[in-house]
Regions:
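Extracytoplasmic cell-surface/polysaccharide-interacting catalytic and binding patches
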Residues: 19-94, 99-203, 212-225
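Sec-dependent N-terminal signal peptides
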Residues: 4-13
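Conserved metal-phosphate-binding beta-hairpin within the catalytic cores
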Residues: 208
């Protein structure tokens, strides 16, 4: 009897999880960042081979960046604030199709492909999932998360003390070996994003999610075109 109850509990839990987390191809509530912020720059890493897998990622058919309309409205506030301080946004990634996340997981499970180890110089490939650097589900797929940095108005580099997708403690927002300038630059980005309604995470200084995201349980899978 206990075994039957356990099986029923597992089945019920699986059904609840399936209902709670939906996959959708509906992009009607999304828009390109370029339609709202006309001076943002782009370096869409997963459209190229310049990422930890060393290959272009599934679902990226163009070097464009989309977000939910709610997230875009908030991002515009941050961009306006930063523009007044002499900065522009450089976008590395925003909405990410579920098929791209599946591509990451398939790469992790391929023992014959180490990708580009410059992105994880001090870790084993298997550590990327163990350390929660890569997961089977990503907030990016819900459409209100963005990876970005600052550039100056003339397009010149702003030193943030590390680059995108560097799987290292250097990427932690509060890494204590940063220079004073690097700390200041990270804080400028952080303060503008938080003021606009986003929240960061403890492992990646470039990663922000809209606090009141409109689709907290939906994972989208349409291509970036």
């Amino acid at each position: 009897m206990k075994k039957v109850l356990l099986i029923l509990l597992i089945l019920f839990s699986s059904i609840q999880t399936s209902i709670a987390s939906q996959i959708s191809n509906d992009k009607s509530d999304f828009a390109p960042i370029s339609t709202v912020i006309d001076d943002a720059a782009y370096d869409i890493r997963y459209y190229s081979s310049n990422n930890f897998t060393g290959n272009k990622i599934n679902g990226y058919k163009a070097p464009n960046a989309y977000m939910t309309k709610e997230a875009l409205a908030a991002l515009k506030k941050a961009a306006d604030d930063l523009r007044n301080q002499g900065y522009r946004l450089l976008i590395w990634d925003s909405y990410r199709p579920q098929k791209a996340v599946d591509n990451f997981v398939a790469w992790i499970n391929n023992p014959n492909d180490d990708g580009d180890k410059t992105f994880y110089p001090c870790l084993k490939k298997s550590d990327l999932i163990k350390g929660n650097y890569i997961a089977r589900k990503s907030g990016h797929t819900r459409g209100s998360t963005i990876d970005l940095t600052l550039i100056k108005k003339d397009g010149s580099f702003v030193d943030m003390g590390g680059t995108f997708d560097l799987f290292s403690e250097i990427s932690h927002p509060d890494y204590n070996k940063l220079t004073a300038e690097q700390k200041k630059n990270r804080k400028i980005l952080h303060d503008a994003m938080v003021k606009a309604g986003f929240k960061g995470i403890s492992s990646e200084w470039w990663h922000y999610t809209l606090k009141n995201e409109p689709f907290p349980d939906t994972y989208f899978n349409f291509d970036v075109e």
